[in-house]
């Protein structure tokens, strides 16, 4: 046995759960040493948070407290960490479209081309509160149910979610989809996983075309002004 690993849970916004786990780990290290087993590795897992609109946290202060406790109680141990969501969570955004609209029980239902068996698996497994941002304007808001494309009654992501009224073909932006989405997505019922578009590549292809268009437009304006 080389060491001990723990995980405090995803999107942990306080150092307290880590400090509590470190107290337990310290006791286990001491018990192991008393039994003649020298542990040399401590894996503090993941759980480091990414920004969310309604969640406040001070990550530098969290890390300061964790590091101080590690220096105090585990100075001789090899420290591992698994910052999964923290590394890739904000690196990917999803664009999903409305493929069906109906009404049930007096409430609109919007069916998307991505569902619980795809990118939104985190709703079930991580209780992750995905944000839905509509490109459609308007001040009117309705409480709606959002479901995925499969025929499974489990494939429902959100109930009572406030949104502007939507139509088939409308697009929704879902930010921060880089963690535990495509990795756990399936092809259930024959639906393909969401395709990736690398923004830097698209930008490199589009910018020269846009630049040429701007030059031509400026030349036309200059000609018209003469």
PLM regions: where:
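Active-site loop/helix belt of alpha/beta enzymes
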Residues: 1-100, 154, 163, 189-191, ...
